[in-house]
Each structure stands twice: as C-alpha cells, then as structure tokens.
Amino acid sequence: MNSFRGRYTNKIDSKGRVSVPAKFRAVSIAQGLNGIICFPPLSEGKFIEGCGPAFSEEIDRMLDRLDPFSEERDMLASVLLGESAELMFDADGRVNLPDNLRELAGLTDEVVFVGAGPRFQIWEPGAYAAFAVEAQKRVPGFRELLKSTQASLRPEGGGGR
C-alpha cells in the first residue's frame, strides 16, 4: 500500500500523544521513515496536514521550482518546512503532536485521521464532521475533474449514473 486511505478516530493522551493508525504507519515505514511529517495546511480549515517522506520530497521539488528569493517561496517554505515537524513513532505507534500544530487545528482530546492519497489530514472530530457534510454536498460537481487513464473505465458518451 502506497497511499493513505480511510478514516480513523483516536484519543490524544494527557502528554499530547496520539496513536497513528496502523495502515498509515505502514505507508510511512514503507517509504523509509519510522514516523510521519506534519505541517500546517495551505487551505482553509482547522486540521493538520501529514505525510510520509515521499510527499515531503515532492514538496521540496515543488519549492525548488520557484525563484529561491521570491516572497512566495519564502512564505510557502516557512509554512511547509519551517512549521513542519518530523514525528517519530514510539514503541506503541504513537507520536507526540506539537503544541503549535494542536492549537492551530483546535485538537484537544480526540482526532480524526483522514486519508488523502499521498498525504493525510488530522482533524478535530466536529470540524471534520462539518467538512465531510459539505464535501458530500459539493463533490458531485467535481466528478468531471476525475479523468480515468484507462479507456475501459471511461463512461460511454460521457453518461453518468
């Protein structure tokens, strides 16, 4: 498995530790890191972005394509790299979420890990529930954005369900 998939709810203990879902740990470990990388989101929403080393390297490549002295690159690097944290798994598969990221996302006693392919998100459960309702309403309008690379999966004549 090379991607983060699924939704898992876990408790944060009094020390700020949370158990990373086993399937998410497996993805990151397969990519060569016994931990995860977390950083603030670039989009609106109260959550933390997370990934393994493969997506982190992609972020580096995206930043490398920008003018190294541009204001935009400096700001993006500040958020994506400067505010990021490499969090190593303990013997029980837990990581210690940094205070700044927990506060940013409004995380207190419980989190929802949400897979997003090459990355994942860590949400406060109520915030994710509201986001999920909105996503379910809006996602039918995004269907055309998904284009299959396999001819056998393309609908005939553009018809839908």
Swiss-Prot record:
It comes from the Bacteria. GO terms for biological process: negative regulation of DNA-templated transcription initiation. One of its GO terms (molecular function) is DNA-binding transcription factor activity. One of its GO terms (cellular component) is nucleoid. InterPro entries: MraZ (IPR003444), MraZ_C (IPR035644), MraZ_dom (IPR020603), MraZ_N (IPR035642), MraZ_sf (IPR038619), SpoVT-AbrB_dom (IPR007159), SpoVT-AbrB_sf (IPR037914). It is found in: Cytoplasm, Nucleoid. Keywords: Cytoplasm, DNA-binding, Repeat, Transcription, Transcription regulation. PROSITE patterns: SPOVT_ABRB. Its main location: cytoplasm. Belongs to the MraZ family. Forms oligomers. This is Transcriptional regulator MraZ. It comes from Parvibaculum lavamentivorans (strain DS-1 / DSM 13023 / NCIMB 13966).
